[in-house]
A protein has these predicted regions:
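A short, hydrophobic beta-strand-centered structural micro-motif
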Residues: 40-49
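Charged, amphipathic alpha-helical segments and their flanking helix caps
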Residues: 1-31, 50-152
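Short acidic low-complexity segments
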Residues: 31-40
């Protein structure tokens, strides 16, 4: 079983933390909507393409395939902006991303794609996260022990 982290599921914790991190580092609003919808430029959209969950020993292991889309200020010019933002986003996603004092993630296998006609780019990669295992089989025993100690 996975502990909730700050009251959030592991998926909410990782994706929410990454959105907060990107907003802080880019000074842009990270939109949470379908790319086909009308978007206000410039902006970033974080898209989680795939989430897989399995066990690493007894510990829950999550893998996230993420796409970070950047839409330039203008549809009519902005190649230089795209190249600069690609470099900036790659740098932001490099190294450890601290979500809390004790939990960090890394984005691996980062690559970029440019959509020149749309004046947009995509930086994509994967996040692997392993969470602590909590053995619930001892939880009732510990609760009973705690009650007995308080009464005793």
């Amino acid at each position: 079983m996975v502990n909730l982290i700050n009251g959030k599921t592991p998926t909410e914790f990782i994706i929410g933390g990454l959105i907060d991190y990107l907003e802080k580092k880019t000074d842009l609003k990270i939109l949470d909507r379908d790319i086909a919808e009308d978007i206000q430029r410039p902006c970033i959209i974080l898209d989680v393409a795939k989430i897989t969950k399995d066990l690493f020993g007894h510990m829950p292991h999550y893998n996230f395939e993420i796409n970070v889309y950047y839409f330039a200020n203008s549809l009519y010019r902005g190649y230089a902006d795209l190249y600069q933002k690609a470099e900036e986003i790659m740098d932001i996603l490099s190294g450890r991303i601290n979500l809390t004092d004790t939990f960090n993630i890394t984005v691996e296998d980062k690559q970029t794609e440019f959509y020149r006609a749309d004046k947009a780019l995509k930086v994509y990669g994967t996040i692997d996260a392993v969470f602590e295992y909590e053995d619930d089989s001892t939880a009732d025993i510990m609760e009973e022990l705690n009650i007995n100690l308080q009464e005793g």
